């Protein structure tokens, strides 16, 4: 019988699946750890599935469709923890309500991810606000709702950078358990190390980043989401961050940090910044058409948008910012024009 002409129905069958060129269906039920190790499969995860172990996709070029009411309770890893060349070219599409998280009782001693994308050419496609990737904070532990090109084993970037990924139409959140858990809480962190100078080529678009809390100056600064970096941190070079919405941090830090060379940041809504709404730290970035407002306590002395004095040839154009009526323009040879700044 030709491939794809038969269906492999999997009911409660956890473990490693090494099939290739097959049509695999996960039927409604509970699963422990699952690994998709085969290549070129069409995989359907039916409504009502629950995965209590980690869901790993280490095979290449699989098409995975996730239907309504599916829970991944111990995270998803696309690729391998320390490699960008494992689990390449997979397309994961969510059609309905999907929830990806981690059990705090299973956290390691330092770094936690809910959605870890390490394989090159990954396309993650959510279904808007119905697709939620959320992680609860924990004292003394760094928590990331989503990372691209980073290792859970030591919290660092993979040595060979992950490239050419698309992440879209997903709700990424950091959740608080009611106590002050310090810094190092991120909704998304993209690559790292020296990858800012490398053309990683990611597209991150039409996502919502937040914390489920509104801006509140009465909350301890130790309870912010940022740790001085940003709720969303883009270190990968030549990355496009387009038409995203970043909701409140608490106090301190910044909402968006752009630390990759030649990144393009367009048409984003960056709300409720801490120290700054957005910070641009690297050369040749285009930052245009963004709405960035409400820095720390609406302080009129702090810029909503800041560029680093060591950066070169940044373009800031057509942005709307508040509260201070200026952009910090320390970068060499930067072009700053046609921005509307001040009280919103």
Question: Where in this protein do the model-derived segments appear?
Answer:
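Fold-core signature of tandem repeat domains
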Residues: 24, 34-36, 43-45, 57, ...
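Consensus "Asn ladder" position of solenoid repeat domains
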Residues: 62, 90, 120, 127, ...
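Short beta-strand/loop motifs in extracellular/secreted proteins, especially
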Residues: 202, 263, 285, 314
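Glycine-rich repeat segments that build the extracellular carbohydrate-interaction surface of secreted
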Residues: 1-29, 38, 42-46, 59, ...
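Extracellular beta-strand-rich, repetitive "passenger/adhesive" scaffolds
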Residues: 1-2, 27-29, 46-50, 65-70, ...
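Glycine-rich beta-solenoid repeat tracts in large extracellular/virion proteins
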Residues: 8-11, 15-17, 32-39, 50-60, ...
């Amino acid at each position: 019988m030709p491939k794809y002409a038969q269906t492999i129905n999997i009911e409660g069958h956890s473990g490693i699946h090494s099939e290739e060129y097959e049509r695999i269906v996960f039927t409604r039920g509970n699963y422990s750890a699952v690994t998709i190790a085969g290549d070129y499969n069409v995989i359907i995860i039916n409504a009502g599935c629950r995965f209590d172990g980690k869901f790993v996709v280490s095979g290449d070029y699989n098409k995975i469709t996730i239907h309504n009411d599916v829970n991944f309770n111990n995270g998803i890893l696309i690729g391998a923890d320390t490699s960008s060349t494992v689990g390449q070219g997979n397309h994961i599409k969510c059609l309905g309500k999907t929830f990806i998280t981690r059990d705090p009782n299973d956290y390691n001693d330092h770094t936690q991810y809910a959605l870890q994308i390490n394989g090159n050419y990954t396309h993650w496609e959510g279904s808007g606000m119905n697709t939620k990737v959320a992680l609860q904070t924990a004292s003394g532990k760094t928590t990331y709702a989503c990372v691209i090109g980073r290792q859970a084993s030591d919290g660092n970037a993979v040595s060979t950078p992950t490239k050419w990924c698309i992440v879209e139409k997903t709700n990424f959140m950091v959740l608080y358990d009611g106590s002050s858990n310090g810094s190092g809480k991120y909704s998304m962190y993209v690559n790292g190390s020296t990858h800012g100078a490398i053309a990683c080529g990611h597209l991150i678009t039409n996502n919502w980043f937040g914390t489920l809390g509104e801006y509140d100056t009465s909350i301890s600064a130790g309870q912010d989401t940022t740790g001085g970096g940003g709720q969303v941190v883009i270190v990968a070079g030549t990355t496009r961050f387009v038409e995203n919405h970043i909701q409140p941090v608490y106090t301190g830090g910044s909402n968006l940090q752009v630390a990759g060379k030649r990144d393009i940041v367009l048409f984003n809504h960056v709300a409720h910044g801490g120290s700054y709404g957005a910070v641009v730290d690297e050369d040749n970035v285009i930052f245009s058409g963004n709405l960035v407002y409400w820095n720390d306590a609406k302080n009129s002395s702090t810029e909503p948008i800041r560029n680093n004095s060591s950066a070169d040839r940044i373009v800031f154009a057509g942005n709307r910012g508040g509260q201070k009526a200026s952009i910090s323009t320390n970068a060499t040879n930067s072009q700053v024009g046609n921005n509307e700044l001040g009280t919103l």
